[in-house]
Amino acid sequence: MISSMLWLVYPWIYNNLNMIYRLVYLLFVIRLNVYPIIIVRWVSINNYSILGIIRLISQIISFEVLLFLIIFIIILIIEDYKLKNLLYYQINRKFFFYIYILYLIFIITLLIDLNRVPFDLIEGESELVSGFNLEYYRRLFIFIFLSEYINLLFIRIILLIIFYGLIYWSLIFNLIYLINLFILVIIRGVLARIRYDYLIYICWIELLVLVLYYLIYMYQIKELIYIIYY
């Protein structure tokens, strides 16, 4: 159900739900996705699942900070919360080109949120066996992984809208969307898993500092523009 709530953010041509704070709603729903996973693991009454919960909480706290800061930088640049205005802002300039470092960090953060290789540490390490789905089979197993892949499809759409500024019914949008999905799927068979301590170190020592630098830089640019023109 929470995975379905994400699609309310998608700016359909005939979408009657004209949300003003779409980006804020997006962050809120993404954050809610963690709680069903925690409940599913806790109900399974399995030691491996409990270990997965502990690892999940620390990992989510670390990288949700990056996700929130990147979205905040985007809001600071466009000075609006609507995805449609985000498209209008990128008609002549694409975020993919002049803040490409944030684009790469955003992809890493999404891979962690989606539990994809090489960051599927909460369910992929040998000491955790299979993570939270260890005690589930048949319908429950299908529902768990169906929600995961629904999130995968939606997040790639939001990524293209935020950083590419593509019209969401165009041929180029669909083509780049399929290419991104293909890359995301084949990553599982190409990359090796990173060590957990390295993952946390990269977040708090390297990536967070870089994102904060961009935040301060963008804020100073906006202040300078305001002083010059107003």
Where are these regions (language model features)?
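Core, highly hydrophobic multi-pass alpha-helical transmembrane subunits of bioenergetic inner membranes
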Residues: 1-230
